[in-house]
Amino acid sequence: QPKAAPTVNLFPPSSEELGTNKATLVCLISDFYPGAVTVTWKAGGTTVTQGVETTKPSKQSNNKYAASSYLALSASDWKSSSGFTCQVTHEGTIVEKTVTPSECA
């Protein structure tokens, strides 16, 4: 089976969640093969380790793999941030997606 680079999607917290003073960022990683990825979260240029949870890759129906990573923040941390980046490393290839709070006020 050929190598396949992951598709990465990064979603900001919902306004409903922000209303409860929580903010969870969701990084979805899909369609990669082989099934091993490293996920690094960054705030600005700083690596974030607190509040991070990454699932183990699971096989999709097309025999490629998918995984997701979550970053839990408080709403105030999210709103005062300059944005967060989900950096996915797969077979030496790096894919980055960034989300900023200004996108949905």
Curated annotation (Swiss-Prot):
A Pfam family reported for this protein in Swiss-Prot or TrEMBL: C1-set
* Top-level lineage group: Eukaryota
Record keywords: Disulfide bond included? yes
Give a yes or no for keyword Disulfide bond in this entry.
yes
Keywords tagged on the record: Disulfide bond, Immunoglobulin domain
Q: Which GO terms describe its cellular component?
A: IgG immunoglobulin complex
> Which GO MF terms does the UniProt record name?
antigen binding
Q: Which InterPro entries does the record associate with it?
A: Ig-like_dom (IPR007110), Ig-like_dom_sf (IPR036179), Ig-like_fold (IPR013783), Ig/MHC_CS (IPR003006), Ig_C1-set (IPR003597), MHC/Immunoglobulin (IPR050160)
Ig-like domain location: 2-100
Record GO biological process: immunoglobulin mediated immune response
**Cysteine-cysteine disulfides:** 27-86
Task: List other remarks.
Answer: This chain was obtained from a mixture of normal immunoglobulins.
Classification via PANTHER family: IG-LIKE DOMAIN-CONTAINING PROTEIN, MHC CLASS II-RELATED
Protein name in UniProt: Ig lambda chain C region
- What organism, scientifically named, is this protein from? Sus scrofa
